[in-house]
Amino acid sequence: MKVHKGDTVLVIAGKDKGAKGKVIAAYPERSRVLVEGVNRIKKHTPQSANERGASSGGIVTQEAPIHVSNVMVIDSDGQPTRIGYRVDEETGKKVRISRRNGKDI
């Protein structure tokens, strides 16, 4: 998967189209990413008391994962771009590059 944790992405489809956010977590086996502040849902959790007596639960708002095809990575110029790969000559490792301008991400 070409989108990694820590990337800044732009949502290009869905109810949050146009929103920017940072990737909190990536789930490559499901092809989904968790983006900060995007696709917020209300989750109903049961009331429970912890050891100090404070209760937790009720309706909690949190982010839900969205499909990786609905986001584009923002490059160093602040523009959305597709991702490509190239092999670094010095280290021999694969590095991600911006398809828009060819710079490393």
Curated annotation (Swiss-Prot):
Keywords: Ribonucleoprotein, Ribosomal protein, RNA-binding, rRNA-binding
Top-level taxon of the source organism: Bacteria
SMART domains according to UniProt: KOW
GO BP: translation
Region feature (Disordered): 40-61
InterPro entries reported for this sequence: KOW, Rib_uL2_dom2, Ribosomal_uL24, Ribosomal_uL24_CS, Ribosomal_uL24_KOW, Translation_prot_SH3-like_sf
Pfam family, one: KOW
Record-level GO cellular component terms: ribonucleoprotein complex; ribosome
GO molecular function ontology, one term from the record: structural constituent of ribosome
Subunit description: Part of the 50S ribosomal subunit.
Annotated function: One of two assembly initiator proteins, it binds directly to the 5'-end of the 23S rRNA, where it nucleates assembly of the 50S subunit. One of the proteins that surrounds the polypeptide exit tunnel on the outside of the subunit.
HAMAP family given in the database record: Ribosomal_uL24_B
NCBIfam families: rplX_bact
Similarity-based family: Belongs to the universal ribosomal protein uL24 family.
Name of the molecule in the record: Large ribosomal subunit protein uL24
Organism of derivation: Mycobacteroides abscessus (strain ATCC 19977 / DSM 44196 / CCUG 20993 / CIP 104536 / JCM 13569 / NCTC 13031 / TMC 1543 / L948)
Lineage: Bacteria, Bacillati, Actinomycetota, Actinomycetes, Mycobacteriales
